[in-house]
Amino acid sequence: MKALQLVKYGEIKDSLAFNEVSKPTLQAKDVLIEVKAAAINPIDKYIILGNLQGMLPIPLPSGLAYDVSGIIVEKGDEVSNFEIGDLVYSRVPQEQMGTIAEYVAVTSVAVSKKPGNISFEEAASIPLAGLTALQSLEYAGIKAYDKVLIHAGSGGVGSLAIQYAKARGAYVYTTTSTNNVKWVKELGADRVIDYKTEDYKTIVKDADIVFDTLGGNYSSEAFQVI
């Protein structure tokens, strides 16, 4: 089968190749997914550049990307919660990374059935970003009536964090650019801050949680608005 592989660390244009590789071998608790859509995330860029070698040592060549949606075409002997033909999506574990391929083997505990009202492409865009948003807010102890500042509300993680925070009953501030103000409001944010024309530090004074995926000065400035 064909798969996109990271063949060396460095600039993206020099580091990737579509290669012919063996179809994955299933373990007892795995399912084999025929890939219909896959997604890339910022972490994939940093892996390619070699910035994460100390934290994520990966033998090369290696498959790339974690998000996938598709159809189950085979399953292991110990898989009882899925059937051949199920439409599914997943954020695959580190050791099974490599979703930009014709097929990917995934442990069944990391797989969910795809909602019928979204496309394969939409489903593939959700898992890693969605889990990042959900797990971060849960770790922060989000609860109803919390005031939450979510930076970069129009990003993949931020847009999902807004929706999850609202579902938990929080009041949501978010920052975004002028072009995305209307869309972010439609996601449910209570106060949208256009960072090109407004300074969020003059608006947010009493946040219970600051959700920051940007880093740099935003991390240190968070203490000014809590």
Model segments located where?
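Cytochrome P450 core scaffold surrounding the K-helix E-X-X-R motif
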Residues: 43-49
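Mid-domain Rossmann-like dinucleotide-binding core that forms the NAD(H)/NADP(H) cofactor-binding site
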Residues: 124-194
